Amino acid sequence: RLAYTRNTLNRKQFASSGNFFECKVSYVRGKELTFPGSTSIIDDTISKNHKWLSIQLEALSFPFQKKQVVNWGLHFKSVLNSQSLFANYTASMLALPGLNVLPDLDTYFIPAYRSTQYVCAGTQLIVSPLKNIDLRLDAYGFFPIIQLILNPDGTFTYAKPLDGRSVLAAGHVIYHSPVGPVRATINYLPKYAQPFQFQ
């Protein structure tokens, strides 16, 4: 695995100034061993070797560096992955890179936001009415280039490019305490069973 990172952000989480750029190149090689369960459409144990190349790019920039009440940032993330399919849909989805431009996306398993190859871009609007208090609105467009879909008969296939495109957003009230951020968040994830989530 190779990685290059340049980071001048003012905070590890919920930054409001600075720039971030990261490029990761990974080569993955492994062996899949699948034992069919009681609901599997596959009868036999499957053993299969896998190898793939993954390239991940991420950039976050706050163009106006001066301290001010209102600030905004531009955020971009992309994954290009040559991963082969696993024996079943769930195993394939678990191995795929998930979208995590919003903090709470790491706590959910949402197949619609997992893709072999995708581009995601958005903006972060930040209002700081008081010291250590931020009101934030993060809004993104998600464009999956290659995405798996589950068929009614239990098989799976690739969707048409950009077929699963979506918008997603989150609003936050954040207090930057000495030990880390304390926040109240409402997420809008239209591809999730309950699109509005409060954290």
Q: Where do the protein language model's features map onto the residues?
A:
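Intrinsic-disorder/low-complexity loop/linker signature
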Residues: 66, 153-155, 179
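C-terminal outer-membrane beta-barrel translocator/porin domains of Gram-negative envelope proteins
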Residues: 2-130, 135-137, 142, 147
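Outer-membrane beta-barrel domain signature
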Residues: 44-48, 108-112, 157-162, 185-189
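Outer-membrane beta-barrel "beta-signal"
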Residues: 173-182, 193-199
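Surface-exposed coil/turn segments at beta-strand junctions on protein surfaces, enriched
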Residues: 114, 128-130, 164, 175, ...
